[in-house]
Amino acid sequence: MNFAGPTKYLRVPVRRVLDVGCGIGLWKGIVERHFPGASYQGVEFSPYLCERFGWQQGSVVDYAASEPFDWVICQGVLPYLNPADVKAALHNLGRLSKGALYVEAVAREDYEQDIIDEDLTDNRVFRHRAELYRRGLREGFVELGGGVWLSRQAEVPMFALEHVGG
């Protein structure tokens, strides 16, 4: 999936990108390719990775920025959080994004439907229901599908079929 497609289609300008839980920065090159000239801010919980790659240390639960970002990426982070921290993180993502959000998180239903290859997946995660994620994100976002959410701050007019539940 071209994660940048929805924002380009909806004409959401992308100048600042936040990758929260960035790890080794796999998204940095993708962001540079899809959004030339946009600044990339990596935030990571691991002090080692921050020192090695120059990221800012922080957590999706309580990371604060001076102003919201146009694109926020949160891949593979939320399942490691307990339920209370997930709720706080989802609320915080709403504060951090004024444009779009890409979220990737395994859910309990993925395990129940045997979609997860447990030999290749870290099983030291909480198996939150997908509805927990959706309910928390709906507060600040409209679901576009494919893990992409549009901030309610974006004030982008959309036709009913352009978003989930429209």
Segments (PLM) and residue ranges:
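A conserved beta-strand element that flanks and buttresses the S-adenosyl-L-methionine
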Residues: I73
